[in-house]
Amino acid sequence: PKTFGITSPISLAAAKDTDCTLMQKLIETLKPYGVFEEEEQLQHRILGKLNNLVKEWIREISELKHLPQSVIENVGGKIFTFGPYRLGVHTKGADIDALCVAPRHVDRSDFFSSFYDKLKQQEEVKDLRSVEEAFVPVIKLCFDGIEIDILFARLALQTIPEDLDLRDDSLLKNLDIRCIRSLNGCRVTDEILHLVPNIDSFRLTLRAIKLWAKRHNIYSNILGFLGGVSWAMLVARTCQLYPNAIASTLVHKFFLVFSKWEWPNPVLLKQPEECNLNLPVWDPRVNPSDRYHLMPIITPAYPQQNSTYNVSVSTRAVMIEEFKQGLAITDEILLGKAEWSKLFDAPNFFQKYKHYILLLASAPTEKQRLEWVGLVESKIRILVGSLEKNEFITLAHVNPRSFPAPSENMEKEEFRTMWVIGLVFKKMENSENLSVDLTYDIQSFTDTVDRQAINSKMFETEMKIAAMHVKRKQLHQLQPSHVSPKKKKHSFEGVKLLSLNDSSIDLSVDSDNSMSVPSPTNATRTSPLNSSGLSQGNSPAAPVSFSVTNVQATDVMVPQNNSTENLGGSLNESIPESATHPGFSSTPKPLVTRVVSSMRLVNQLQKPVSNTITKMPSPVAGVKRTSSPSNEDSPKKNKTEEDENDSSISADVDDQNKLETEELKEVHSEEKSSSPVPGSLPFSQQSSTDLSDISVVPATPIPVIKNSIKLRLNR
């Protein structure tokens, strides 16, 4: 039999009747969440139309460039799909990722001019726009109601045959870097499908895992969690280790494998291949920066890249804890003690932590807000990385979902978006008081955002960032009912957080269904924050028994600097490490200052100790999630014969898990001997090049307004 993956499988066991029953229950549980696409025929028809348009356009270009008639008749051209649609896990309302492949005589400029014009002439095409200067250039459109993103790649071929296999590495020869990036999505997707033993089982398992990740707020590559392709590769590796298992078993094995995975050992679906094309590939033996990646998941197509280079100490700790919780729940499901719905219950993020940082991005128009929010969000992981390096902070957990916030000044139109970061502070055994100054951490973040805004020439007047600290109980004072727990029937409307001189800051949040994660259609509709469990009555034990007595929060406005030269780089490019911790300029006066309670300055502004993190911490312990099984949940009762049977079954599951854990260690041993593994080095967040062609941003600081958050924590 064919072996999948770089190691032998853990188990070849086939599905039992109970597994099939559980799989049917899983399918029924998934249906209300809209994870199964209902418009497949429409999408197939639209892609067929698009494919015909591409062929027609390439023939026209060929005639304009006076190619021989014999070549024109067979010139070809083709639309390929990639991402969730190609993997077969496309969800309702999601867009389709497509790639236009053209022969060598068709230029990228042709794609963004004549093909763009051709699309504009189609009645079915709406909302047409091109982003030619993006890291991966793209044309976006809505075709007959279906959102489509089209990339472009020109191959060094005279014609494009219908049976072209993009996995052929020789196709990459003599291509520019933008074409290689554009091809990468299709090549990775196709490789994944060729490396799993059973595509149907893979697809159903991936649908379940993606829904679980979104519901548990750990689905976001840009914020340091995992994106779609990374989740697909983890599921594919699980399928390789259990080639005969069906989805109900694979979901459980997924949590078993990755709750016990020995990070930073990389996840590989196949042995990396050498192609001698001189392209940068992930290899910690050669590239020092690759040794610092915490959770490497390596794409199977050349040039191999780490799809999770954004993962930080905190995001990895959060994900590993979620893997462990997923294992505990699926153990219960296999024992018949829980239903699949429990796995997809959204955890209570807004009750989980005692301290939070709120980030607010605002702009004077909706169009500017969209651009500004995109930039700020792409850099939040830098703030998380800076916070987790603070010697007093154990964990910084950003909620991947942002929320709309109303304008602070009702007389002036303003569009605002808010993100929430949960903090766990270190417990100090020999100190009654703990003074924490987060000014430097916030300043580093705002410096980076400001630099990028000016470099990319997207900055507009009145674009602002605000950051402030709030305690868990203050979150409940926000205006909308979907932020406050529904314990009382009276409205919280009009309640605002108190600040200096009787001024106030209104952090109320409007509902925005477009921001919400999938939720069952037959359940009561809730707003985004509600779906995260904020309305649940029981709050878990606070991670830290500190209280905040002193808080300062300052709005930050990007300065207008018309004389600043273009320092290079684009909106979607990675920022070098040197740019994430810029030096400070002289302190200008803040535009607006707000202080909660009287302020006693503690800790002068200084850089945090650089070597506070010298090893990769284990997942945070002691934080009880709302869905965690607890001994307090059920009172003790006399043991019956049924209980003894349950205990026997439970012991069998535990024994099986332990046995497979030992086999998993053997898998790690095999992988260590056959793959490059990062060395044991001190943690230092590094930017991945990821086929990047960015220029280094100079370290000269751009003057910005200081954003000060200083806390006095009492035990």
UniProtKB/Swiss-Prot annotation:
Mg(2+) 2 binds at residues 95, 97, 149. It is an enzyme of class 2 (transferase). GO terms for molecular function: ATP binding; metal ion binding; poly(A) RNA polymerase activity; RNA binding. Mg(2+) 1 binds at residues 95, 97. One of its GO terms (cellular component) is nucleus. Gene3D superfamilies: 1.10.1410.10, Beta Polymerase, domain 2, Poly(A) polymerase predicted RNA binding domain. Its cofactor is Mg(2+); Mn(2+). A motif (Nuclear localization signal 2) lies at residues 624-639. Its EC number is 2.7.7.19. It is found in: Nucleus. A motif (Nuclear localization signal 1) lies at residues 472-489. Keywords: ATP-binding, Magnesium, Manganese, Metal-binding, mRNA processing, Nucleotide-binding, Nucleus, RNA-binding, Transferase. SUPFAM superfamilies: Nucleotidyltransferase, PAP/Archaeal CCA-adding enzyme, C-terminal domain, PAP/OAS1 substrate-binding domain. The keyword Zinc does not apply. The record marks 135, 140, 310, 381, 506 as: Interaction with RNA. Monomer. Polymerase that creates the 3'-poly(A) tail of mRNA's. May acquire specificity through interaction with a cleavage and polyadenylation factor (CPSF). Belongs to the poly(A) polymerase family. This is Poly(A) polymerase alpha-A. It comes from Xenopus laevis (African clawed frog).
